[in-house]
């Protein structure tokens, strides 16, 4: 006879860390070159003018300017950065 109670094991009790995806700079917001605009899996949003795409599909600004989101129907949704005039 066992003198100690057998301890059960659970197959639960794990959780992965959040990936922190989503839009990091919203429409109309001023960004600097190199700053991340959108973190995404796949190309839900496509790079437009003055926007680059990283190997993990992250969209980032290539120049300083204002973020603009454009829906072009069947072509998809694009993110662009419009340069801000130095006079402002």
UniProtKB/Swiss-Prot annotation:
InterPro entries, per database record: Ribosomal_bL27, Ribosomal_bL27_CS
Any one GO molecular function term: structural constituent of ribosome
One Gene Ontology term, aspect cellular component: cytosolic large ribosomal subunit
Domain of life: Bacteria
Gene3D superfamilies registered for this protein in UniProt: 2.40.50.100
Pfam families: Ribosomal_L27
SUPFAM superfamilies (UniProt xref): Ribosomal L27 protein-like (SSF110324)
PROSITE patterns: RIBOSOMAL_L27
GO biological process, one term: translation
Keyword annotations of the record: Ribonucleoprotein, Ribosomal protein
Homology family: Belongs to the bacterial ribosomal protein bL27 family.
NCBIfam families recorded: L27
The name this protein goes by in its record: Large ribosomal subunit protein bL27
Organism: Acidobacterium capsulatum (strain ATCC 51196 / DSM 11244 / BCRC 80197 / JCM 7670 / NBRC 15755 / NCIMB 13165 / 161)
Lineage: Bacteria, Pseudomonadati, Acidobacteriota, Terriglobia, Terriglobales
């Amino acid at each position: 006879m066992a003198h100690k109670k057998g301890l059960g094991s659970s197959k639960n009790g794990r959780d992965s860390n959040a990936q922190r995806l989503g839009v990091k700079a919203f429409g109309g917001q001023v960004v600097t070159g190199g700053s991340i605009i959108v973190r995404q899996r796949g190309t839900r949003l496509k790079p437009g003018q003055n926007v680059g795409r990283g190997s993990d599909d992250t969209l980032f600004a290539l120049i300083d300017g204002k973020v603009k989101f454009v829906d072009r129907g069947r072509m998809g949704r694009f993110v662009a950065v419009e340069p801000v005039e130095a006079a402002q």
